[in-house]
């Protein structure tokens, strides 16, 4: 590096780093990086106007601007700067990938650490959750896997405040775009795999290989991969990891940790499993048999981090469901779930169908996001038609697409089943609640924890759970 960055930063009394001109603060250094969709060089003047004390670029055309410094490799300069400003990380790092279940597993692992007396945090779709001390983090970018700078900023802050264990989601996009760079983890988990994000990856094979980069590129040599044995492609995954000399263990109905029986009800479930030739049993208030494997993936991650197995099992009764993940709203038979893939929707509906009373009905309200994988829309309609008695199609973050066309693509998969189409999501939820009878169950799917609705380029306040609560007060459904 031709410039001594540490000396430069001291000279200009630099306070922070940024790669986004929108987030630049006074005395920051702005790194003008050319990305997939935007070029940071186009925002140099914007960054300077917001108080950037220096700009670093690999585009020579911009060095005529005052305070702009040229380097041959801006990414390498950013990496060096990160090591200067944000060198610390929690000692124990655990990463979780999978189509569905990532948010649940990272939360379960972090919660369990806290229940066993350790300071832990999780990063992912829901944001940053901190257990065992006050919440320290604000202004987290809305990405499942953060950009490398944001990740290191947060990790440094957590380490500075005594967090020992950090669990984070690793999305296929983040892995494919190498957002984690050289981050290495002690444990890497694979929760599930089914169709999603084909608008980005194009093929299911590319999507799977992107997921597997977590294990190949980021797992420490002495680390372990924890896999859901019920993944359809599990044999391919096992062979792939074996060929790369990666140690792994499986969880599931055919796993090394074998789930033998699950009894579910509206109040939770009782789970039986065997591990190392011993039988175990535990209760959890968390609903959904698919959560059994998520909870037990969390158990094994704790076990291989050095915690006593029996202590971990004993703590599970206190682990809470994640917001928007099969979340039962107050004392009603109405559930909010993030299910936004065909597989997740089918699993959520199957669970609720299995625990409802014989003569009661199961209804679902859902839509599909705009500017996202179009191929899954008809499949989600198909899954709803297979599992639900009443289907209400509505809007779910249509973004810049015509919402009517999105709904039509969903409806094309419903075929002969009856459905109701209500564009306005609040009205759709209200309609679903109004039509509930004694012991009926309603699933509001697709948004989960989200507290917004994206229409065009506008992000409007909208929270499924809060809308349900509001409608319940008006409609007084029978719980």
From Swiss-Prot:
Transmembrane segments: none annotated. It comes from the Bacteria. InterPro entries: Mur-like_cat_sf, Mur_ligase_C, Mur_ligase_C_dom_sf, Mur_ligase_cen, Mur_ligase_N, MurE/MurF_N, UDP-N-AcMur-Glu-dNH2Pim_ligase. Its main location: cytoplasm. It comes from Rickettsia montanensis. A motif (Meso-diaminopimelate recognition motif) lies at residues 396-399. Belongs to the MurCDEF family. MurE subfamily. It catalyses: UDP-N-acetyl-alpha-D-muramoyl-L-alanyl-D-glutamate + meso-2,6-diaminopimelate + ATP = UDP-N-acetyl-alpha-D-muramoyl-L-alanyl-gamma-D-glutamyl-meso-2,6-diaminopimelate + ADP + phosphate + H(+). Carboxylation is probably crucial for Mg(2+) binding and, consequently, for the gamma-phosphate positioning of ATP. Catalyzes the addition of meso-diaminopimelic acid to the nucleotide precursor UDP-N-acetylmuramoyl-L-alanyl-D-glutamate (UMAG) in the biosynthesis of bacterial cell-wall peptidoglycan. PANTHER family: MUR LIGASE FAMILY MEMBER, UDP-N-ACETYLMURAMOYL-L-ALANYL-D-GLUTAMATE--2,6-DIAMINOPIMELATE LIGASE MURE HOMOLOG, CHLOROPLASTIC. Its EC number is 6.3.2.13. It is found in: Cytoplasm. Signal peptide: none annotated. This is UDP-N-acetylmuramoyl-L-alanyl-D-glutamate--2,6-diaminopimelate ligase. Keywords: ATP-binding, Cell cycle, Cell division, Cell shape, Cell wall biogenesis/degradation, Cytoplasm, Ligase, Magnesium, Nucleotide-binding, Peptidoglycan synthesis.
């Amino acid at each position: 590096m031709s410039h001594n960055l540490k000396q430069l930063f001291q000279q200009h009394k630099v306070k922070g780093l940024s790669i986004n001109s929108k987030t630049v603060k006074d005395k920051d250094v702005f790194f003008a990086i050319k990305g997939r969709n935007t070029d940071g060089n186009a925002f140099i003047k914007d960054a300077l106007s917001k108080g950037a004390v220096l700009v670093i670029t690999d585009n020579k055309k911009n060095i005529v601007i005052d305070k702009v410094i040229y380097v041959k490799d801006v990414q390498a300069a950013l990496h060096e700067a990160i090591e200067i400003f944000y060198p610390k990380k929690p000692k124990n790092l655990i990463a979780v990938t999978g189509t569905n279940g990532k948010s649940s597993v990272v939360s379960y692992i972090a919660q369990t650490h806290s229940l066993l007396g350790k300071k832990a945090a999780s990063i992912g779709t829901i944001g940053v959750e901190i257990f065992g001390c006050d919440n320290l983090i604000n202004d987290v970018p809305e990405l499942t896997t953060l950009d490398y700078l944001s990740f290191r900023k947060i990790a440094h802050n957590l380490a500075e405040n005594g967090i020992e264990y950090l669990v984070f989601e690793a999305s296929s996009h983040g892995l494919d775009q190498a957002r984690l760079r050289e981050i290495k983890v002690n444990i890497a988990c694979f929760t599930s795999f089914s169709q999603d994000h084909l608008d980005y990856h194009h093929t299911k094979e590319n999507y799977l290989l992107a997921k597997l980069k977590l294990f190949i590129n980021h797992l420490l040599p002495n680390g372990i991969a924890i896999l859901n044995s019920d993944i359809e492609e599990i044999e391919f995954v096992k062979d792939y990891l074996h060929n790369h000399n990666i140690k792994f263990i499986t969880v599931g109905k055919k796993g090394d940790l074998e789930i033998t029986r699950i009894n579910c009800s509206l109040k939770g479930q009782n789970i039986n499993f065997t591990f190392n030739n011993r039988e175990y049993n535990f209760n959890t208030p968390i609903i959904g048999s698919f959560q059994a494997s998520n909870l037990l993936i969390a158990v094994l991650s704790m076990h291989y981090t050095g915690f006593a197995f029996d202590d971990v099992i004993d703590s599970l009764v206190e682990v809470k469901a994640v917001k928007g993940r099969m979340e039962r709203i107050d004392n009603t038979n109405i559930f909010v779930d993030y299910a936004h893939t065909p597989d997740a929707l089918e699993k959520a509906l199957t669970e609720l169908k299995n625990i409802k009373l014989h003569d009661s009905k199961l209804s679902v309200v859902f839509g599909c996001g705009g500017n996202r994988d179009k191929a899954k829309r008809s499949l989600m309609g198909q899954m709803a038609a297979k599992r639900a008695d009443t289907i209400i199609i509505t809007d779910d973050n249509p973004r810049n697409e015509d919402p009517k066309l999105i709904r039509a693509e969903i409806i094309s998969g419903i075929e002969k089943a009856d459905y109701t189409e209500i564009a306005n999501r609040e009205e759709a939820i209200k309609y679903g609640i109004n039509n509930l009878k004694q012991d009926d169950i309603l699933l509001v799917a697709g948004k989960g924890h989200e507290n917004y609705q994206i229409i065009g380029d506008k992000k409007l306040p909208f929270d499924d759970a809060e809308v349900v609560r509001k409608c319940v007060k008006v409609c007084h459904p029978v719980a």
